[in-house]
């Protein structure tokens, strides 16, 4: 898991990992999928699935802290504002040799460019929400979300 994704890879994930439909039940399944991945790997994370202007799934594993919820909020806000995964935003700014949180138009209390938040998109519709994980190094938070989305989208397409 040490290999970095290229910006092109990250944009490809965003293009590929879109739902044909998404509702409250889908949000619940996505949250449960993330919880299962975390438990199977004995990782301590906080999870949020936010869509349609509300939190549809939230879970904090025993051992997580309030800080994880604060990170979730900041990551989510970044995706909602910029329309890309929080990991992409961080890598994009890194490629530009700048710190995202130090830019004049960014309030670091509200936004952060650390991996773990990913846009929830409905094909031919657009951004409807954000799925976020906090508790691991940013690359691993991002990968956990990618794994859960990949599994869920495949299972939904089969049914």
Swiss-Prot record:
HAMAP family: UPF0303 (MF_00761). It comes from Psychromonas ingrahamii (strain DSM 17664 / CCUG 51855 / 37). It comes from the Bacteria. Gene3D superfamilies: Haem-degrading domain. This is UPF0303 protein Ping_1243. Pfam families: HbpS-like. Belongs to the UPF0303 family.
